[in-house]
Amino acid sequence: MRHPRVAGSFYPANPESLLAMLREYTYPAKDESVIACVSPHAGYVYSGRTAGKVHSLLPDAETFVIVGPNHTGYGLPVAVSTDTWLTPLGEVEVDTEFVEAMPKIITAPDEIAHRYEHSLEVQVPFLQYLHDDFKIVPICLGMQDEETAMEVAEEILTAERETGRKVVVIASSDMHHYLPDEECRRLDSIVIDAILSMDVKKYYETIYRLQASVCGYGCIAVAMYYSKAKGARAELVDYSTSGDVADRSQVVGYAGIVFRV
């Protein structure tokens, strides 16, 4: 069992308080054309509104593949969890059949990478609130280079074909970190434009040129590769910074993006 790491800090540990917050942040408008998204993973008080706007658009799916960055350094470089995940709202099963269908060229089963990582966990209560009868596939990226992102996307596509699952991919990432609000917004707009272009090489060039402190940049690239393979286009749903609710001298940016076919 993968127990919650950040319940009581990033989001309420009390189920009723958590449900009240999720009700406030979501406006369900499920869109069957959405196949993937970028959703932030900070504390809900900071990024919950942006995350909620994204999650509100996600259609029901059999399997939500959540790809998040490894902030801790623990575990394997590209780690897939197969444990049941627990949140204050209950248990969520991992789609082990989907995991077994992944070729494991670059991914590997590993729980250690997930044990203390928050980036995937904070997406799960949104899914529990908005959807019934689903499973997840949590993938934690310690490596985020372009080749890794492409290979992870290919493994997801392969497993999707072999299992016939209806899949939605969630890239969990914040944008730039710890900059003055105006500068954060300026740099984030450049990165967001690169994402919306659906040109992964241009996107990586932008990340490296800016030395961008986008924690899940490779996770975003997985969603881009996956979506590009299906002929999808990207759309910015919402953008905010922590400066909207806290000090503006050092902020973190949050982009909500969906990929539609």
Curated annotation (Swiss-Prot):
Belongs to the MEMO1 family. It comes from the Archaea. Disulfide bonds: none annotated. Gene3D superfamilies: LigB-like. It comes from Archaeoglobus fulgidus (strain ATCC 49558 / DSM 4304 / JCM 9628 / NBRC 100126 / VC-16). This is MEMO1 family protein AF_2310. NCBIfam families: AmmeMemoSam_B, PRK00782.1. CDD domains: MEMO_like (cd07361). It holds the Pfam family Memo.
